[in-house]
Amino acid sequence: MELRLYDTLTRDKRPFTPIDPANVRMYVCGPTVYDFAHIGNARPVIVFDVLFRLLRHLYGEAHVKYVRNITDVDDKINDRAARDYPGLPLNEAIRKVTEQTERQFHDDVDALGCLRPTVEPRATEHIGEMRSIIEKLVAGGFAYVEQDHVLFSPSAMNAANGVLPRYGSLANRSLDEMIAGARVDVAPYKRDATDFVLWKPSKPGEPSWPSPAGIATPGRPGWHIECSAMSWKHLGETFDIHGGGIDLVFPHHENEVAQSCCAFHTERMAQTWMHNGFLQVEGEKMSKSLGNFITIRELLATNKFGGRSWDGATLRLAMLKTHYRQPIDWTVDALHEAEKAILDWSDFAKDATPVRCDEVIAALTDDLNTPKMIAELHALRRAGKADELRGAMQLLGINPVVRAPVDLDATAKSLIEARTAARANKDWKESDRIRDELAAMGVVLKDGKDADGKSVTTWELAR
């Protein structure tokens, strides 16, 4: 079957033809490891896991290489490390934060049924490649040194002759539109407002490496150069698919294209650019100020959303019910619907032998049309085709055996019930003791009232 994918650059759906069918290559921007991943972060992880599975099905497992990076150098990481480990040297504190957060991320996405990428490179392990690209850009006249910074010049890129794309092509915006439509940091070391940082000097105590381009002061990379370096190292100068959230189109992916194409004198960095849409929660933008910010871990292990925890397979199916390019509204009702479907499918097909279903494959090869694929799964269930249903679930990455909620959920509920009884008996000492016990488990209690004015206690994992 012919695979057709929507390309953000060309703004149309077209046949996917890999550069080398024996070596299909995909890069997806991964997490910055400073905190628990939120449910919006889960969307690209799940979407491109489905694409990874489909590519492996079409071209063979040995012929698909999926790279998803780990960003382990960032101001947010530095801030978190200084806050959480004030008594440690910053570099040691950073290592603790990044290693712990990376483990948490893997635990969460494993629970969502996602395969591990072929390669998961860390930014700090690719400083040499970043320096090399920066040196190429400076030598080619696309970047310049100013006040111990190295900056890329989009104007220089657009003035160059040859095969290079126009800066702004991916976002479909001109330089003037980018300035008008975005907050652009006009620092004194910039020649033009649209210039962006490739390398910057480190502050005392911050992570630092020898700088490129003859700069004597140690420094660290800018955000965008990291992905250009890691994709080059593991996939080459040009590869098949680059994916991520739609929020990354500009500036991150636009700047990746600029860096890579100018460094290697290529027309394209990736043959196909894919971006998933935004996520909102119960009709509102997710934000901490609205109180609807929720992590994957909280969905899996607390009662913060819908008064209960949810199985990873349920979260996965709920995410896939909306086409990846469309905005998704994350609701409790959608999770209940997904759970009902999985329970029904699992009971029906858990002992079946997986076989291929062409209608299901056809839906996925049409730009990952997961809503249509899910409709086909329902049709298989109605038709009593257990083997095909089991095969489709397997391809979609949904385990037919629904896991029970994690033990922490039951433990917390039991303790909360005991505390509620203690409070009813005005045994404040016991109530406080239980609160402290839960706090030691990393569980934060919130006392309040429901719509009827009845006292209720909810809980969430401490960050």
From Swiss-Prot:
Q: Where does it live in the cell? A: Cytoplasm
The cofactor binding remark recorded in the entry reads: Binds 1 zinc ion per subunit.
The transmembrane segments are: none
Q: Does the keyword Kinase apply?
A: no
Q: What is its main location?
A: cytoplasm
Q: Where, by residue number, is the motif 'KMSKS' region?
A: 285-289
- Motif 'HIGH' region in this chain: 31-41
MF terms (GO), sorted A to Z? ATP binding; cysteine-tRNA ligase activity; zinc ion binding
Name the EC number(s). Answer: 6.1.1.16
Which reactions is this enzyme annotated as catalysing?
tRNA(Cys) + L-cysteine + ATP = L-cysteinyl-tRNA(Cys) + AMP + diphosphate
Q: Which family does it belong to?
A: Belongs to the class-I aminoacyl-tRNA synthetase family.
Instruction: Indicate what this protein is called per its UniProt record.
Output: Cysteine--tRNA ligase
Q: Which gene encodes it?
A: cysS
